[in-house]
Regions:
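Low-complexity, intrinsically disordered segments with a bias for serine/threonine
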Residues: 12-13, 23
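N-terminal signal peptide c-region/cleavage motif recognized by signal peptidases
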Residues: 15-17
Length: 228
């Protein structure tokens, strides 16, 4: 009887981790631009946005992710999610990013960034994260962000005070993400972003091999427009 009880206890612990996994695992592509709530910035947030220059301040120019939301929202870039018994692994094609997120509570949160590229460079702009399940929904909490931009097109900022939650679930065959940013120093109310993704038949993401970018093409286009 003791042996049966022991086996049952072990199964409750380990099988629970397996049973909590969902259909989130797979390779996904963004479906359209998504939606966002009204952006209500504090005076500090407004100042950062006003000072932002896309052609100078976009971290993408140096192959650096501006934020987690910026990477989720990149069109035509594969994203692979792998659910393990003790962690979530997310591979983003953009910038060859690899995100390792331990499963548990905030006691498993590391001071180090959760994301690195294939060369091993860590990116604090993506924060430090841990994850847990609520039913069929995967919840990712992220803290310890370096300054960056939630929206690079408009300079919507994040800061070391930023707290982010990603709620990820599959509905009707599509992956849905509700991404909530809270930061009292930057936002009067939380900023909520929503995206959907379609599953594709692929085993992995492609290699991006980023090199430092520039906006020369954009400047040339503007110069041509000005001369017309």
């Amino acid at each position: 009887m003791k042996t049966v009880a022991f086996i049952s206890s072990v199964c409750l612990f380990f099988c629970g981790s397996v049973f909590s996994q969902t259909s989130i695992s797979g390779v996904w592509l963004l479906n359209g631009p998504g939606t966002e709530s009204a952006i209500q910035l504090t005076p500090l947030g407004e100042q950062i946005r006003a000072d932002y220059d896309l052609l100078e301040d976009d971290p993408s120019l140096s192959c650096t992710p501006a934020s987690v939301s910026r990477i989720w929202a990149n069109p035509n870039s594969r994203i692979k999610i792998t659910e393990q018994t003790d962690a979530i692994e997310i591979s983003y094609e953009l910038f060859d990013l690899r995100r390792h997120i331990p499963l548990g509570d905030d006691s498993v949160l590391s001071d180090s960034p959760s994301t690195r590229n294939l060369s091993g460079t860590l990116f604090a702009e993506m924060g430090s994260s841990f994850a847990f399940y609520e039913g069929a929904t995967l919840i990712i909490e992220s803290r310890n962000h370096a300054p960056g931009y939630i929206r690079t097109s408009r300079g919507i900022p994040q800061s070391p005070n930023t707290f982010a939650i990603e709620e990820i679930e599959v509905r009707d065959g599509e992956l849905h993400i509700t991404h909530t940013y809270r930061d009292g120093s930057l936002f009067e109310v939380p900023l909520v972003l929503e995206y959907s993704f379609r599953r594709i038949e692929a085993e992995d993401v492609d290699i991006y091999s980023c090199t430092d970018a520039d906006y020369d093409w954009f400047l040339e286009l503007n110069n041509k427009s000005d001369s017309n």
